[in-house]
């Protein structure tokens, strides 16, 4: 009995302490915060995040409480931005204030203590690595020069589809392999030996990094950090990642050259690592973090977008017919179409934009407010975590008619681009931290998609109809399909 009473006393003491600390923190906040749902002691609004994907749940909250909403998640204060107006103010007007990232256990472990480009803080290291990435890999000139790689890997994919004619094929798997090969050859000069294992690690890491980890939401609690079992799982994954990347980098050091006959971006990073005048030294972990960036942002997002585009076209057969008619007319007689050729495909561009509207590669964009400021009349305290709900903005009826309907024709009436100029449609982000690889990514979506539509007609397996298609998403930073896309390709014969 004495033991039971002791435990009750301890629990009451701990809860009382946590509640008092919660009230003390709340007293330090400014009075003009964004609207907020009712919260519970200690956990704040954590209970509201149950029962769905984060972007879906957060959309429901902002629909009820306003496009700018304040949430207390454990000890951490967050603000959700779900309108084009608030996002424009944060990412354009106040861009330097919101250009930072916040730390998480997942990014610290898998992205080498954020010594990469995607999760790096807004500092000299980030500016330096981004500049190298854009100039050496992602410039429009380089994107065009990678045309022969896209053509080569597309030819492989077409052969795979041809060999499966009349039979069901896992299109998701084959498209991912193609995307992976294009990125590896363009960035590193060759296909990685353990490319498949690395791709699996990327999917697993992106899935785990997309959720809310309790240890991240209670940073002062050493106990939750100790009991964070996902941390130990991530550390094991990091060990596997190190084995793959260390082996690749050792091979890279002894090889003479890649397929371009000169330096690739890894060579450039190694050369600059020796430069003593660099503002921020480039470490070996920084190079590995960059490689993981290229894989996670370059392969998974492009492959996912192609899969969603094909899924939406299969779900909407009349749109499929229109897209195929345009592609087959404009590309007729062109054996190896690339970026310049697909520029003529107006409806295909609309299909891709509509896909990115409904299925953005980054449904939630994380930022950190560096200093206290004001957004749409509300005070945002310094160090507040920001979540830009790109998925919700793309489905907002204030900007889009019939927002949940796949309708590429809407872009005949509404002129909006996807490169960060129009804040109603920002699948690649905006401002200083807009995705540097967006032109590379778009080329790796549009060219393969055009060829898949040109060469094949498609059916669903068994007795499935378009209405039966599962369009569910699964947790992940890139918003992937819950289930793989299974299709039956039939070779298109223009003379039939």
UniProtKB/Swiss-Prot annotation:
Tissues expressing the protein: Mostly expressed in flowers and, to a lower extent, in leaves, especially in glandular trichomes.
Cofactor: heme
Applied value in biotechnology: The monoterpenic phenol thymol is widely used as a fragrance and a flavoring ingredient in food and cosmetic industries. Its derivatives have also several biological and pharmacological properties such as antimicrobial, antioxidant, anticarcinogenesis, anti-inflammatory and antispasmodic activities. Medical applications include the treatment of disorders affecting the respiratory, nervous, and cardiovascular systems. It may also act as a growth enhancer and immunomodulator. The monoterpenic phenol carvacrol is commonly used as a fragrance and a food flavoring ingredient and preservative. Its derivatives exhibit also various biological and pharmacological properties including antioxidant, antibacterial, antifungal, insecticid, nematicid, anticancer, anti-inflammatory, hepatoprotective, spasmolytic, and vasorelaxant. Phytochemical inhibitor targeting the main SARS-CoV-2 viral protease (Mpro) and ACE2 in human host cells, carvacrol is a possible candidate for treating COVID-19.
UniProt feature coiled coil, ranges: none
Biological function: Involved in the biosynthesis of phenolic monoterpenes natural products thymol and carvacrol which have a broad range of biological activities acting as antimicrobial compounds, insecticides, antioxidants and pharmaceutical agents. Catalyzes the C2-hydroxylation of gamma-terpinene to produce carvacrol. Mediates also the C6-hydroxylation of (4S)-limonene and (4R)-limonene to form carveol.
Entries under Pfam families matching the protein: p450
Cellular component terms per the entry's GO annotation: membrane
Protein name: Cytochrome P450 71D180
Keywords associated with the record: Heme, Iron, Membrane, Metal-binding, Monooxygenase, Oxidoreductase, Signal-anchor, Transmembrane, Transmembrane helix
Subcellular location: Membrane
CDD domains found in the cross-reference section: CYP71-like
Organism field: Thymus vulgaris
GO biological process, one term: response to salicylic acid
Enzyme Commission number(s) of this protein: 1.14.14.-, 1.14.14.51, 1.14.14.53
EC top class, as a word: oxidoreductase
InterPro entries on file: CYP450_71D, Cyt_P450, Cyt_P450_CS, Cyt_P450_E_grp-I, Cyt_P450_sf
One annotated GO molecular function: oxidoreductase activity, acting on paired donors, with incorporation or reduction of molecular oxygen
UniProt keyword annotation of Heme present: yes
Span of the signal peptide: none
Main location (coarse class): membrane
Catalytic activity from the UniProt record: (4R)-limonene + reduced [NADPH--hemoprotein reductase] + O2 = (1R,5S)-carveol + oxidized [NADPH--hemoprotein reductase] + H2O + H(+); (4S)-limonene + reduced [NADPH--hemoprotein reductase] + O2 = (1S,5R)-carveol + oxidized [NADPH--hemoprotein reductase] + H2O + H(+); gamma-terpinene + 2 reduced [NADPH--hemoprotein reductase] + 2 O2 = carvacrol + 2 oxidized [NADPH--hemoprotein reductase] + 3 H2O + 2 H(+)
Impact after mutating residue 386 to T: In strain: cv. Tc
Keyword Iron part of the UniProt annotation: yes
pH dependence, entry free text: Optimum pH is 6.4-6.8.
Induction summary: Induced by jasmonic acid (MeJA), salicylic acid (SA) and UV-C irradiation.
């Amino acid at each position: 009995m004495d033991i039971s009473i002791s435990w009750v006393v301890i629990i009451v003491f701990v809860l009382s302490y946590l509640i008092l600390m919660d009230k003390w923190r709340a007293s330090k906040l400014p009075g003009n915060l964004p609207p907020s749902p009712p919260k519970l002691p200690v956990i704040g609004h954590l209970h509201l995040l149950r029962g769905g994907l984060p972007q879906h749940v957060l959309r429901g909250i902002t629909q009820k409480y306003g496009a700018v909403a304040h949430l207390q998640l454990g000890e951490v204060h967050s603000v959700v931005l779900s309108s084009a107006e608030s996002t424009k103010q944060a990412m354009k007007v106040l861009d330097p204030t919101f250009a930072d990232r916040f730390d998480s256990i997942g990014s610290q472990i898998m992205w080498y203590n954020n010594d990469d480009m995607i999760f790096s803080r807004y500092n000299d290291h980030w500016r330096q690595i981004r500049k190298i990435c854009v100039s050496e890999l992602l410039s429009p000139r380089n994107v065009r020069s990678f045309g022969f790689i896209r053509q080569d890997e597309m030819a492989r994919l077409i052969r795979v589809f041809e060999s499966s004619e009349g039979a069901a094929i896992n299109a998701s798997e084959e498209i991912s392999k193609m995307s992976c090969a294009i990125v590896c050859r363009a960035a590193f000069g060759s296909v990685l030996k353990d490319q498949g294992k690395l791709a699996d690690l990327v999917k697993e890491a992106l899935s785990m990094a997309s959720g809310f980890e309790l240890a991240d939401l209670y940073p002062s609690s050493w106990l939750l950090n100790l009991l964070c079992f996902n941390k130990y799982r991530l550390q094991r994954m990091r060990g596997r990642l190190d084995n793959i990347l260390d082996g690749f980098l050792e091979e890279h050091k002894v090889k003479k050259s890649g397929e371009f006959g000169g330096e690739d971006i890894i060579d450039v990073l190694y050369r600059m690592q020796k430069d003593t005048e660099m503002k921020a030294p480039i470490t070996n972990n920084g190079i590995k973090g960059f490689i993981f960036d290229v894989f996670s942002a370059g392969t998974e997002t492009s492959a996912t977008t192609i899969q969603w585009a094909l899924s939406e076209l299969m779900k909407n057969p009349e749109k499929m017919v229109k897209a195929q008619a345009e592609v087959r007319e404009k590309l007729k007689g062109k054996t190896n179409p690339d970026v310049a050729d697909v520029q003529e495909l107006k409806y295909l561009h609309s299909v891709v934009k509509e896909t990115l509207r409904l299925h953005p590669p980054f449904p939630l964009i994380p930022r950190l407010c560096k200093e206290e400021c004001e957004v749409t009349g509300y005070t945002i305290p310094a160090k507040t975590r920001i979540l830009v709900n790109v998925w919700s903005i793309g489905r907002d009826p204030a900007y889009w008619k019939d927002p949940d309907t796949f309708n590429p024709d809407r872009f005949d009436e509404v002129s909006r681009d996807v490169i960060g100029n129009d804040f109603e449609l920002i699948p690649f982000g905006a401002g200083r931290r807009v995705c540097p690889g967006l032109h590379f990514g778009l080329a790796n979506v549009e060219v393969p998609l055009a060829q898949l539509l040109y060469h094949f007609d498609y059916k669903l397996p068994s007795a499935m109809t378009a209405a039966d298609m599962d369009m569910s998403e699964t947790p992940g930073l890139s918003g992937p399909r819950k289930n793989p896309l299974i299709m039956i390709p039939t070779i298109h014969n223009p003379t039939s």
